[in-house]
Design a protein with these regions (language model features):
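Short, conserved phosphate-binding/catalytic loop or strand-edge motifs used
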Residues: 115-119
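Active-site beta-strand/loop microenvironment that shapes enzyme catalytic pockets
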Residues: 121-123
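C-terminal accessory/tail domains of diverse enzymes
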Residues: 1-113, 126-212
């Protein structure tokens, strides 16, 4: 491994992420209990009064809250519509996340596209620039078909929840080459005709494979 690659890998390990994993066939209280037992804290409780979404939460040994929330897009009985929402994670937490998913699966959780389930990964913005995000958008646009095939995404999910990079956004992004995050945000919303309510959680620009 050359020095440049080594440095890139070390920098990648500093990246913060948040992960959301949708599943069914397990109720949220049961999932939270499994997590609390895995963490060795035994601490889990109903936090819907604070978090909404019929949430149950579990806490790890670092005091971080892992949430299990209701997501209506998941198939099955309402009591078993379960979305794991992690706290902010780093590379060091990957084995913990993987083992938790294994424990949940052993407890009965199921997750695949036929159940209306997906995975969302939120990347921390720290360290990124308009240029790195433009590079990311272009890389994603050139590999989306491979990702869709590998994940066996059906046409409905691609057209509704996992839309490909909007060609209007990509064209303006590469033509204007924004130098500030504010300019990048303007291109993202205006190119897709979603500048109204851009601070709203359910803005119409969401539900792409890549969301900025």
């Amino acid at each position: 491994m050359n020095e440049k690659t080594r440095i890139q890998i070390e920098e990648m390990k500093k990246q913060t992420i948040g992960v959301e994993v949708e599943m069914n066939n397990i109720d949220r209280s049961r999932a939270a209990k499994v997590a609390a037992e895995f963490f060795g804290t035994g601490r889990y409780e109903n936090t819907a009064h604070r978090n909404g979404y019929s949430t149950w939460s579990a806490w790890d040994s670092q005091g971080r809250e892992w949430k299990f929330q209701k997501d209506v897009s998941i198939s099955g009985p309402d009591s078993e519509k379960c979305e794991l929402v992690t706290p902010i994670l780093t590379y060091a937490d990957m084995e913990t996340l993987q083992e938790m998913i294994r424990r949940l699966r052993k407890a009965g959780a199921k997750s695949d596209s036929t159940r209306g389930c997906g995975v969302h990964i939120h990347i921390g913005a720290k360290g990124h620039t308009p240029q790195t995000l433009r590079n990311l958008a272009n890389i994603m646009a050139s590999h989306e078909s491979l990702l869709a095939e590998a994940l066996d995404l059906d046409h409905y999910r691609i057209s509704r929840y996992c839309r490909t990079v909007d060609p209007r956004f990509l064209e303006q992004l590469n033509r204007r080459k924004p130098t500030t995050m504010a300019d990048l945000a303007d291109i993202w919303y205006r190119s897709q005709g979603t500048n109204y309510g851009r601070s709203h959680h359910y803005n119409d620009s969401r539900y792409h494979m890549l969301n900025l």
